[in-house]
């Protein structure tokens, strides 16, 4: 049994694959299996990976390429990878990102030394090769995950494979990591954290204001809501949640945030209002919800969110340029 299985979804990532593959095959941890799950990518992504693999002959026997029978989306790809994984621990790496070459040795070493079910790390957000921010990836509780105070990304979370057996599969491809991570966290006995950034999330900005962008936003929104409603139902049916817990209320409101950049557009404002409307009566009285979040909530209802956001953004940029 390998120490670690790394699941790498592959779809239209040809320009980024060489960088990702090189950092994976260059890992200082020797005992790894690499599962490249090809979601019927129409480009040369897999060819690029195989070319890089020639530089690492010792890794050839550790690489598996599985091609999905049809383009199936991120959720199905991740679940296929989990089904194929043989490692003691499992982690995901998105093929347009990259990892520190010591990442998996550090995570696995801590997991073994402390008998952890889940071990997390911090990550760096990059754009055009420039670091934008460092994000803490630690996760201490499901409640804090649902409140949006801790991360649920699979790329910074190494999970004991036995926790992933029998999980309910996500039903859509946006927010699929939250469905998997929350279930794993509920089953975990012990968790730990490596307090340094080992993963590099490479942000590529997409417009959501033009026609194509709106279509993409609509699709992402519907997909997120499918998984959000599925997760809430799962928590209530299988894990004894009532639906009135502060973290569930805050999670419902958190789901609406995807619409905040376009909430000034009437159709999206209406969609925002109609999504989990029951939280509107509760969010202002929720102690776990920050004053800032309540402030923006009120401004959205007053239809002032967009102009105030633009003004505060201008002042922030102006102050940064003066410093």
Explain the meaning of each model-derived region.
Residues 1-25:
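N-proximal low-complexity "stem/linker" segments adjacent to membrane-targeting elements
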Residues 65-85:
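Glycine-rich, basic loop-to-helix element that forms the pyrophosphate-binding segment
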Residues 90:
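Short aromatic/hydrophobic "clamp" motif used to bind/position activated sugar donors
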Residues 199-205, 211-243, 257-282:
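Catalytic core of nucleotide-sugar-dependent glycosyltransferases
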Residues 263-323:
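Membrane-interface aromatic/basic loop that binds lipid-linked glycans or pyrophosphate carriers
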Residues 141-223:
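Conserved nucleotide-sugar donor-binding catalytic segment
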Residues 60-61, 103-171:
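Flexible acidic/His/Gly-enriched loops in nucleotide-sugar-dependent glycosyltransferase catalytic domains
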Residues 21-67:
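Acidic donor-binding segment of Leloir-type glycosyltransferases
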């Amino acid at each position: 049994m390998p120490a670690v299985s790394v699941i790498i979804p592959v779809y239209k990532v040809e320009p980024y694959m060489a960088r990702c593959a090189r950092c994976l095959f260059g890992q200082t941890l020797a005992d790894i299996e690499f599962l490249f799950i090809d979601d019927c990518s129409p480009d040369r992504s897999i060819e690029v990976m195989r070319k890089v693999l020639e530089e690492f002959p010792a890794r050839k026997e550790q690489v598996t390429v599985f091609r999905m029978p049809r383009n199936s989306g991120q959720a199905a790809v991740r679940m296929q990878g989990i089904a194929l994984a043989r490692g003691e621990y499992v982690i995901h790496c998105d093929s347009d990102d990259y990892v520190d070459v010591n990442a998996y040795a550090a995570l696995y070493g801590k997991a073994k030394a402390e008998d952890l079910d889940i071990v997390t790390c911090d990550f760096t957000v990059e754009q055009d090769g420039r670091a934008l921010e460092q994000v803490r990836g630690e996760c201490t509780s499901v409640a804090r995950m649902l409140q949006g105070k801790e991360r649920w990304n699979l790329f910074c979370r190494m999970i004991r494979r036995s926790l992933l057996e029998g999980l309910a599969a996500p039903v859509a491809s946006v927010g699929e990591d939250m469905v998997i991570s929350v279930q794993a966290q509920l089953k975990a006995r012990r968790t730990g954290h490596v307090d340094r950034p080992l993963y590099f999330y490479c942000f590529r900005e997409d417009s959501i204001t033009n026609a194509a962008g709106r279509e993409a936003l609509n699709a992402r929104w519907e997909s997120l809501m499918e998984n959000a409603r599925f997760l809430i139902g799962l928590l209530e049916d299988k894990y004894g949640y009532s639906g009135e817990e502060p973290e569930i209320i805050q999670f419902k409101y958190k789901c609406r945030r995807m619409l905040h950049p376009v909430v000034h557009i009437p159709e999206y404002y209406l969609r925002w209002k109609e999504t989990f409307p029951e939280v509107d009566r509760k969010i202002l009285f929720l102690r776990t919800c920050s004053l800032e979040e309540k402030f923006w909530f009120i401004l959205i209802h007053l239809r002032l969110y967009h102009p105030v956001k633009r003004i505060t953004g201008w002042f922030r940029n102006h102050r940064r340029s003066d410093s």
